[in-house]
């Protein structure tokens, strides 16, 4: 049986390069991925290297609030 709250929670990962660059110029978009993380194993913010189709390279995608 499960104890307490759900251990797995859905999180959104957003490209950090697109967010920084969109302030200075008009960007075509911001890359976002939806994934799940285990709250017990990773209590802090999740950061993964993923491919950004707007930057055309692999960049760090950080967890954002919903």
Curated annotation (Swiss-Prot):
It is found in: Plastid, Chloroplast. GO terms for cellular component: chloroplast; ribonucleoprotein complex; ribosome. InterPro entries: Ribosomal_bL33 (IPR001705), Ribosomal_bL33_CS (IPR018264), Ribosomal_bL33_sf (IPR038584), Ribosomal_zn-bd (IPR011332). The keyword Chloroplast applies. GO terms for biological process: translation. Keywords: Chloroplast, Plastid, Ribonucleoprotein, Ribosomal protein. It comes from the Eukaryota. Its main location: plastid. GO terms for molecular function: structural constituent of ribosome. Belongs to the bacterial ribosomal protein bL33 family. This is Large ribosomal subunit protein bL33c. It comes from Coffea arabica (Arabian coffee). The lineage of its organism: Eukaryota, Viridiplantae, Streptophyta, Embryophyta, Tracheophyta.
């Amino acid at each position: 049986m499960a104890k307490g709250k759900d251990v797995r929670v859905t999180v959104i990962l957003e490209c950090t390069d697109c967010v920084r660059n969109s302030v200075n110029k008009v960007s075509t978009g911001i890359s976002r991925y939806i994934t799940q993380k285990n709250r017990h194993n990773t209590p802090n913010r999740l950061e993964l290297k993923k491919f950004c189709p707007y930057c055309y390279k692999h960049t760090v995608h950080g967890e954002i609030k919903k």
